[in-house]
């Protein structure tokens, strides 16, 4: 691997894409690991990240155009040739600052450095055709589902689902946002600072800061570089969390001195939000299956100056008798398909619908078990980062049908919207991640 130039960034990007395709690795984890090995400059690391996420966000569209100029089917090419072609085509079609000739020549070089010199002529010819025709590319397929699927690189099953839930026009708006860069959203830590002071501090460190348009204490950042190098992060004056997830505070109605159970707590954002709202007074029990994730929660709490959080390694489906009826608020942020956060994790879109088929059963089991921990008069909060009804309102509706000791209870959002016990947030409507949130009250007498 060559050092100190943008070609090195391309080699690094190729390694990430190959790891994702060959090993099923998640892009964010694979990218972080690869950047740790490559020792790239900040500029090259940014280019590497842009290529990785850009190729993933546009894979079906890139395949469509490449297939028009390649004499062989892309999936018949020896690995990693298809990814080399996508890397080159992405730069030609989407990165104005990269000259076409550089995108072509460096892609040819990737062939040579990855044992595919014999295919360098094919890669050169295909990418030159893409560059020559980029103002006159092949038309997209006809029909709304096929067109939207290729144009925004989402599988047709998901496009059809979105159209059934929204409309063709609004589904397209959702898909468009999925392919945009996701803002880095952080929450102010009121135990250590306030919004104005944090904004001033971050701007003083050269960070571009925009307060969220309607979620108090939520800031959107850009130009941060590595967040962990910021003094404000090191000193615990903010935590990373999307605006939608922070709205758990609205549904949970936390108060000082409460006992709160966070059933599926990792990576800890909702437990931290609870601690902020409770002014660090009370008890929060944060649970997860894996001790390594609990360790990160404890480290985060220490950084933020939170002392009311304890952790426990627990399966959310396994009943703990000693917790029965003991908690004022129980939070169930259950494992889900993640289809509301595709702009953060673009590789989620390429999952098959069948990959998610077992989730509602798991979600129901966690909700059923967690409800047993809510004291009479207490709150049960259920949330996901997906937009699929079968993981959202269908789960909570079915739960309430089977448990008349619980009922939906209305709550309000900071933008004035009143939710009749549950709601779905949409990125194209609400400037948040896609997110489902519900609030259920246990009756004082069962």
Mark where each language-model region is.
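S-adenosylmethionine
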Residues: 1-446
């Amino acid at each position: 691997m060559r050092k100190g130039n943008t070609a090195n960034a391309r080699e690094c990007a190729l390694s990430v894409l190959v790891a994702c395709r060959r090993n099923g690795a998640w892009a964010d984890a694979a990218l972080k690991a690869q950047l740790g090995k490559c020792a790239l400059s900040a500029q090259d690391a940014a280019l590497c990240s842009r290529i990785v996420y850009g190729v993933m966000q546009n894979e079906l569209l890139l395949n469509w155009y490449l297939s028009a100029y390649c004499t062989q089917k892309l999936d018949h090419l020896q690995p990693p040739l298809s990814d080399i072609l996508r890397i080159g085509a992405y730069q030609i079609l989407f990165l104005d600052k990269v000259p076409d000739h550089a995108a072509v020549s460096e892609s040819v070089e990737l062939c040579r450095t990855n044992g595919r010199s014999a295919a360098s002529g094919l890669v050169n010819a295909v990418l030159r055709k893409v560059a020559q025709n980029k103002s006159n590319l092949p038309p997209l397929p006809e029909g709304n589902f096929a067109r939207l699927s290729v144009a925004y690189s989402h599988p047709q099953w998901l496009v059809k689902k979105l159209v059934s839930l929204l409309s063709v026009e609004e589904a397209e708006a959702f898909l468009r946002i999925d392919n945009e860069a996701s803002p880095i959203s952080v929450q102010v830590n009121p135990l250590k600072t306030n919004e104005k002071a944090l904004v001033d501090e971050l701007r003083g460190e050269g960070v571009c800061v925009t307060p969220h348009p309607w979620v108090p204490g939520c800031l959107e950042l850009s130009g941060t570089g590595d967040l962990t190098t910021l003094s404000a992060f090191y000193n615990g004056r903010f935590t990373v969390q999307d605006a939608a997830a922070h709205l758990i505070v609205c549904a949970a109605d936390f108060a000082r001195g409460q006992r709160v159970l966070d059933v599926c707590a990792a990576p800890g954002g909702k437990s931290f939000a609870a601690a902020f709202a409770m002014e660090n007074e009370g008890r929060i029990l944060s649970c997860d299956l894996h001790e390594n994730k609990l360790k990160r929660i404890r480290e985060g709490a220490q950084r933020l100056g939170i002392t009311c959080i304890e952790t426990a390694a627990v399966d959310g489906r396994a009943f703990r008798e000693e917790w029965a009826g003991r908690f004022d608020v129980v939070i169930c942020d259950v494992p889900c398909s993640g289809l509301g956060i595709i702009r953060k994790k673009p590789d989620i879109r390429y999952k098959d619908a069948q990959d998610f088929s077992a989730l509602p059963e798991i979600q129901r089991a966690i909700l059923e078990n967690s409800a047993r921990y809510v004291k009479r008069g207490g709150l049960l909060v259920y949330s996901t980062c997906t937009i699929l009804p079968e993981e959202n309102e269908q789960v909570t509706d079915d739960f309430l049908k089977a448990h008349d000791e619980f009922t939906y209870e209305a709550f309000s959002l900071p933008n004035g919207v009143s939710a009749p016990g549950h709601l779905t947030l949409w990125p194209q409507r609400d400037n948040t991640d896609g997110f489902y949130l519900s609030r259920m009250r246990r009756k004082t007498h069962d």
